Amino acid sequence: MTNEFLHFEKISRQTWQSLHRKTTPPLTEEELESIKSFNDQISLQDVTDIYLPLAHLIQIYKRTKEDLAFSKGIFLQRESKSQPFIIGVSGSVAVGKSTTSRLLQILLSRTFTDATVELVTTDGFLYPNQTLIEQGILNRKGFPESYDMEALLNFLDRIKNGQDVDIPVYSHEVYDIVPEEKQSVKAADFVIVEGINVFQNPQNDRLYITDFFDFSIYVDAGVDDIESWYLDRFLKMLSLAQNDPDSYYYRFTQMPIGEVESFAHQVWISINLTNLQNYIEPTRNRAEVILHKSKNHEIDEIYLKK
């Protein structure tokens, strides 16, 4: 075990699934299929074995937070204000963060009676392409400097205080922020914030993004596996763009497949792998739970912070 995991409890899938009584997953096969990323793989068995125990653990953390807030209120002799329970989900590009986040959104809304759950991706806090071009960092898109971290921190602060917030919307199809389009994030019982950068420190290191999280998850996998999933996703995006000239990926449909594969591999090496090794993976130990995926996308190990 490396020093990074000294303060984590390593739990096998078999042990983890025994930590929660067996119940029927509160969603159908069709619903599960509709929320998974198109190159991801997940089954109702995964929901039962991994995600229902995880939802139960989140319930424990939420109850603990509420008990502490109540005790603080007594100490300060004032009524404690209700705050959303904020969950951060991080991990590499193409590792399956979005599937995990969307699944949690459904499970939490159905596990907690009448609970409202909002889901936000930090892609909306990327600077628009034009801004990146003007700053000369379009080739650094996805790296820490390409995000408006001040806006992200401001969003988290307002959400933590129970305010409704409108945030920008990012489209992977057009590879840019969508002008004039906003996502309205309402005050909710749970807010899930998903992105490669949610555990990273902003340049203003007096305030950390993780300070706003009540629970945090890192989705992990071997580098070779993530590369394979990324290349597979890239090629599948091409198939979706065949008849869509507005798609960022449409131009690649006009190229020989060998050139496309070479380009995608170069993007992985120069951008995504570099970003993973230098900025994303080093934040892994800031998570409360690390979900490790094997080659077939199945979660085989769980690391729980002691």
Swiss-Prot record:
Organism the protein comes from: Streptococcus pneumoniae serotype 4 (strain ATCC BAA-334 / TIGR4)
Taxonomic lineage from the root: Bacteria, Bacillati, Bacillota, Bacilli, Lactobacillales
The EC number(s) this enzyme carries: 2.7.1.33
Protein name: Pantothenate kinase
InterPro entries according to UniProt: P-loop_NTPase (IPR027417), PanK (IPR004566), PRK/URK (IPR006083)
Catalytic activity of the protein: (R)-pantothenate + ATP = (R)-4'-phosphopantothenate + ADP + H(+)
Gene Ontology molecular function, alphabetical: ATP binding; pantothenate kinase activity
UniProt key word Cell wall biogenesis/degradation: no
UniProt enzyme class: transferase
Listed GO CC annotations: cytoplasm
Transmembrane residue ranges: none
One GO term of the biological process aspect: coenzyme A biosynthetic process
Cross-referenced HAMAP family: Pantothen_kinase_1
